[in-house]
């Protein structure tokens, strides 16, 4: 039987469930597929099939994560659910499944718990732009405790607002009751998905963003000049476009005089394509792997940033010992690696394998950096951590 082709008729969104352990993230994921399967918009995935997660690797880190897909009448969703707290931290920091928005699951009986807070903070640091809240286990609240739910909601709204998530919709329901088919609770799942449809905007497509291509290789073609190759990360580049070469050395401007793909000339290259760009007046020694070619003034090179980082445990192939301020590993961004010096925040003496921490990095060479960008940390040829740039300092 021939493989089904992916029909792109609806906008595609990546989301995930986040929240404290045992508040019902996986049950909710199953309940969503059940409610939508009744309308022919999903295949029902039961709890055990989601909970039995495959291992995947992102930036050298093993993550357990389940990917489920479903549709609403308006959109196609890819939904990631992770079993353990550490897997969420790793998944969000490495960007294994970049989220356009998240469903924060909170048990109405417990309210916000430590991991609820940690996931909200992480979501902010790694750039998850929107959150919709599902207040779960509402069936376990008695009439006389109904007022407590209002307090839980108020506390949640304050928590979210503190971290920059204003006016997040909060839907009350019971994932378990919906999964069991209780009609009034299935309706709540539909209400939740409507809130997700309405409050998590479709992200801008990569081709609509300013052009950027990390340089992977440089060739010299006699009589024609210098060609740089790489995969276009975003935007579109056309013959005749003015571009900048950013990173490692002083920024330079040039003009793209040719775009090639598989040795064929093209009028333009766009996001996702592997291309060669012919650059006017640039010598082979003027450019190198690790620089980026981009739309003028869309990206600058920097040497100092704050990063949100997950440090691998010894069992994951990471370090065996802690590190301190002054630690100098290699930081990998796109196609380049640069040595950086770590400064730990005040009050943090050391970082242990398995920790999730935010610290400052001073790079020894300038690199084209942006907030929200992912990086890996390596030492002696192995990955010891991964992170996201939470703030550019200089």
UniProtKB/Swiss-Prot annotation:
The UniProt record gives the binding positions of GTP as: 19-26, 81-85, 136-139
Q: What is its EC number?
A: 3.6.5.3
Top enzyme class: hydrolase
Region (G4) residue ranges read 136-139
Annotated region described as G1, given as residue ranges: 19-26
Please give the superkingdom of this protein's source. Answer: Bacteria
User: What's the short name of a Pfam family annotated to this entry?
Assistant: GTP_EFTU
Q: Does the keyword S-adenosyl-L-methionine apply?
A: no
User: Where is the segment annotated G5?
Assistant: 174-176
GO molecular function terms attached to this record: GTP binding; GTPase activity; translation elongation factor activity
Which residue windows are coiled coil? none
Q: Which annotated residues bind Mg(2+)?
A: 26
What's the stated role of this polypeptide? GTP hydrolase that promotes the GTP-dependent binding of aminoacyl-tRNA to the A-site of ribosomes during protein biosynthesis.
User: What name goes with this protein?
Assistant: Elongation factor Tu
Lineage per the UniProt record: Bacteria, Pseudomonadati, Chlamydiota, Chlamydiia, Chlamydiales
Q: Give the encoding gene's name.
A: tuf
């Amino acid at each position: 039987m021939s493989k089904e082709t992916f029909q792109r008729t609806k906008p595609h969104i990546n989301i995930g469930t986040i929240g404290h352990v045992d508040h019902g993230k996986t049950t909710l994921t199953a309940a969503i597929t059940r409610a939508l399967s009744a309308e022919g918009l999903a295949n029902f995935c039961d709890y055990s099939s989601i909970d039995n997660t495959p291992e995947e690797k992102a930036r050298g880190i093993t993550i357990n994560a389940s990917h489920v897909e479903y549709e609403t009448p308006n959109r196609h969703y890819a939904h990631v659910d992770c079993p353990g707290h550490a897997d969420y931290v790793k998944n969000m920091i490495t960007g294994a499944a970049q989220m356009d928005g998240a469903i924060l699951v909170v048990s109405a009986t417990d309210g916000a718990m430590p991991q609820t807070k940690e996931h909200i903070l992480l979501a902010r640091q790694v750039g998850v732009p929107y959150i919709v809240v599902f207040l779960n286990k509402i069936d376990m609240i008695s009439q006389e405790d109904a007022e407590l739910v209002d307090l839980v909601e108020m506390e949640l709204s304050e928590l979210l607002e503190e971290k920059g998530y204003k006016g997040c919709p909060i839907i009350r329901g019971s994932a378990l009751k919906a999964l069991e088919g209780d009609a009034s609770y299935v309706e709540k799942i539909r209400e939740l998905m409507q809130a997700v449809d309405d409050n998590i905007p479709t992200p801008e497509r990569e081709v609509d963003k300013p052009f950027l291509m990390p340089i992977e290789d440089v060739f010299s073609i006699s009589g024609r000049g210098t060609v740089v190759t790489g995969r276009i990360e975003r935007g579109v580049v056309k013959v005749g476009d003015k571009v900048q070469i950013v990173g490692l050395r002083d920024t330079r401007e040039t003009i793209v005089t040719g775009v090639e793909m598989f040795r064929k000339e093209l009028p333009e290259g766009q996001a996702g394509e592997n291309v060669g760009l012919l650059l006017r007046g640039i010598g082979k020694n003027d450019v190198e792997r690790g620089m980026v070619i981009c739309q003028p003034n869309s990206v600058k090179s920097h040497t100092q940033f704050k990063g949100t980082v997950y440090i691998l445990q010894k069992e994951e192939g990471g370090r065996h010992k802690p590190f301190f301020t002054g630690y100098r590993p290699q930081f990998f961004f796109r196609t380049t690696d640069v040595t950086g010096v770590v400064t730990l925040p005040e009050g943090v003496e050391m970082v242990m394998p398995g920790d999730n921490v935010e610290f400052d990095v001073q790079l020894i060479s300038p690199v084209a950096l942006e907030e929200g960008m992912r990086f890996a940390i390596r030492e002696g040829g192995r990955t010891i951590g991964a992170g996201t740039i939470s703030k550019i300092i200089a």
